[in-house]
Regions:
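Short amphipathic alpha-helical signal-transduction/dimerization elements
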Residues: 25, 132, 136, 140-147
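Generic structural detector for well-ordered beta-strands
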Residues: 7-11, 38, 56, 69-71, ...
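Hydrophobic ligand-binding cavity/cleft-lining segments
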Residues: 1-48, 102, 149-152
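Hydrophobic pocket/interface hotspot
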Residues: 17-18, 27, 53, 70, ...
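Short alpha-helical basic/polar micro-motif
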Residues: 15, 95, 137
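Beta-strand/loop substructures that line and gate deep hydrophobic ligand-binding cavities in soluble
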Residues: 80-134
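Short, surface-exposed coil-to-beta transition loops
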Residues: 3-5, 63-67, 90-93
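Glycine-rich portal/gate segments that line the openings of hydrophobic small-molecule binding cavities
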Residues: 39-85, 138-142, 150
Length: 152
């Protein structure tokens, strides 16, 4: 099962990065391969906000839509993404934002996935790997656009 785990230090507050990643409806504007995202449901569970959303990813002529539950834990600065339905056998994704100081944080990103179809995995696997490796940079770039850049 392919997986990727990265830690990136960014020049933005942990709360800012949490808010940016939590704003799933903006993903089509900057997340690699994300063509659309539709929120199905919003709720609160034990002080955590929960979003159920459909994300459509597209690459050339291939389009796949999958549904995930996104749990936003602002108190812990953690975001958990749980796969519900779509072309994957499994998909697990989580983010943790660890403050370094008031203007910087470490962003921990983890994702593992396995396509249900071997053929789809062969067709899209390498492209997904490349896209996921660009995720941290895409979010950092978006943070620079939204919050401005800060000197190191």
């Amino acid at each position: 099962m392919p997986q990727l785990s990265t830690t990136t230090r960014v020049r933005h507050a942990a709360s800012e990065m949490f808010d940016l990643v939590a704003d799933v409806e903006r993903y089509p504007e900057f997340v690699p391969l994300c063509q659309s995202l539709d929120v199905r449901q919003r709720s609160t569970d034990g002080g955590k906000h929960v979003i159920v959303a459909d994300m459509t990813v597209a690459y050339k002529l291939i389009r796949q839509t999958f549904t995930s539950r996104v749990t936003l834990d602002r108190a812990k600065l953690e975001i958990l993404v749980e796969y519900l339905e779509g072309p994957f056998r499994s998909l697990n994704n989580h983010w943790t934002f660890r403050p370094v100081d008031e203007h910087a944080c470490d962003v921990d990103f983890f994702i593992s996935y396995e396509f249900r179809s071997r053929a789809l995995g062969l067709l899209m696997g390498a492209m997904f790997d490349a896209a996921f490796r660009r995720f941290a940079g895409a979010f950092e770039g978006r943070a620079d656009q939204v919050y401005g850049t800060r000197a190191a």
